[in-house]
Amino acid sequence: MKNGLIIINCIILTIGTCGGPLLTRLYFTNGGKRIWFMSFLSTAGFPIILIPLLVSFLSRRRSNRNPNNAENKRKTKLFLMETPLFIASIVIGLLTGLDNYLYSYGLAYLPVSTSSLIIGTQLAFNALFAFLLVKQKFTPFSINAVVLLTVGIGILALHSDGDKPAKESKKEYVVGFLMTVVAALLYAFILPLVELTYKKARQEITFPLVLEIQMVMCLAATFFCVIGMFIVGDFKVIAREAREFKIGGSVFYYALIVITGIIWQGFFLGAIGIVFCASSLASGVLISVLLPVTEVFAVVCFREKFQAEKGVSLLLSLWGFVSYFYGEFKSGKKVVDKPQPPETELPILPVSDYVA
């Protein structure tokens, strides 16, 4: 069951990590200018989580109605989350909303390749925060993975200069760069914070509960961005922006908006799902290894240059990915193969022929 969840979360995280930045950049390069609106879309797809939550609720209710179930008289809860976990999820959600704005601001003015490069630096900080917050244990394989991925991202930086879009001013480029750096640092803190929340929760953390946590986090993040949209007046100009969109007009615009919200939801759900199934470091490693893949898609979709350094970075990232998960496989195998202590047998007592 756990292996299946890991595979599912890896797939949806892959789709979200690669697709989210590309769709967001597509919006900004074709007439879209609403940064708060894009921040809103990053988590606005949370209602789709209600589908698996409904399935989980119906399954629990069916189980409680089973006459063989000792707890069949207890009323089935619609939500499993208790108040302390609810409050913690809101706080993390507000931080996520802020992170969404910072990242969307960066994507508005930076090429996908550059923003991916900057976001990739979160791995080193993710490892640091994981060590400080949840006492993450490092193995030679995980250390090797962090070093390889960090070096790969550093190689990408060799040709990051000179990629400023022609339509952007120097000030916009620099501010976008700094915003993306802060976004990387903040999300590197958020992932271990989610793992710490799991560990400190006073209730059993199950995958349905993880879905509830994700929904509350996204609801809080979306509310944060809605306030920003009201302040800057985004709601008043969306219809006009749709009509003036350069590709496909209003129909394509609204289709892009819906798909972007769904894809980004996959990113966040996959990220915290891997934190649940493995660790925050594992989630950070997978996100980092997918960044060069996003670079390749950016080259194809936006005709960004693909220098030799990007190819080397891609190979190093794949090497780091294999190194990390090979180490996890070996650690798991050692636990399985560890000899169990023999059962203690009671001594055989002599049977006396004497009958009282």
Curated annotation (Swiss-Prot):
Domain of life: Eukaryota
Known function: Proton-coupled purine transporter mediating adenine and trans-zeatin uptake. High affinity transporter for pyridoxine involved in the uptake of vitamin B6. Also able to transport caffeine and adenosine. May be involved in the uptake of cytokinin, caffeine and nicotine from the xylem sap into shoot tissues.
Protein name as catalogued: Purine permease 1
Pfam families reported in the protein's UniProt record: PUNUT (PF16913)
Family: Belongs to the purine permeases (TC 2.A.7.14) family.
Keyword vocabulary terms for this entry: Cell membrane, Membrane, Transmembrane, Transmembrane helix, Transport
Transmembrane segments: 4-24, 35-55, 78-98, 114-134, 138-158, 174-194, 213-233, 256-276, 282-302, 311-331
Tissues where this protein is expressed: Highly expressed in leaves, stems and flowers, lower in siliques and not detected in roots. Expressed in the epithem of hydathodes and the stigma surface of siliques.
Biological processes per GO annotation: cytokinin transport; purine nucleobase transport
Domain EamA: 35-158
Compartments where found: Cell membrane
GO MF annotation list: purine nucleobase transmembrane transporter activity; purine nucleoside transmembrane transporter activity
Highest classification ranks of the organism: Eukaryota, Viridiplantae, Streptophyta, Embryophyta, Tracheophyta
Membrane-protein topology: Multi-pass membrane protein
The UniProt record lists the keyword Membrane: yes
Gene Ontology, cellular component aspect: plasma membrane
Chief place of localization: membrane
Protein activity control: Inhibited by diethylstilbestrol, N,N'-dicyclohexylcarbodiimide, carbonyl cyanide m-chlorphenyl-hydrazone and 2,4-dinitrophenol. Competitive inhibition of adenine transport by isopentenyladenine, cytosine, cytidine, hypoxanthine, kinetin, zeatin, nicotine and caffeine, but not by zeatin riboside or kinetin riboside.
